[in-house]
Amino acid sequence: MTYQEALALVRTEFETRKMTPNCEVIKTNRTLDGCHSFPITLYDRGDEIILNDLGDTKEVFFEVEHAEWQELCETHGFEFDHWRIIRPFKGMQDLYDFIDFLDFIADRFDPLDEDY
């Protein structure tokens, strides 16, 4: 699948906003903490198309250590590279999984949760 084909597929369900010629922000109606929208981008690396959070998730949950991020990502089938959550995009299920993972992160590290 080309980047343009992937982008057209994503746009069948979500609005996007161009950041650069090879990167689009995917708009969802979800937030990490009530203020920060889910940071999901579709990015063309040239050799593959990926979903990427641009490292913004760790900026919201800054108290979470690198090792914990690494473990969470590996456990749930994501890459964690240079503080970025990454997953290759092969189809819409990858995007749904990315959204579900960010939902999981938002619930796990909810700053309003007294147990956290």
Question: Model-predicted segments: where are they?
Answer:
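Generic marker of "main functional regions" within proteins
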Residues: 20, 36, 61, 112-115
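N-terminal ordered "arm"
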Residues: 1-49
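Generic ordered-secondary-structure signal
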Residues: 10, 59, 108-112
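Extended hydrophobic/Leu-rich segments
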Residues: 6, 10, 14, 40, ...
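Solvent-exposed, charged helical/coil patches
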Residues: 79-116
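Intrinsically disordered, low-complexity regulatory segments enriched in Ser/Thr/Pro
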Residues: 37-87
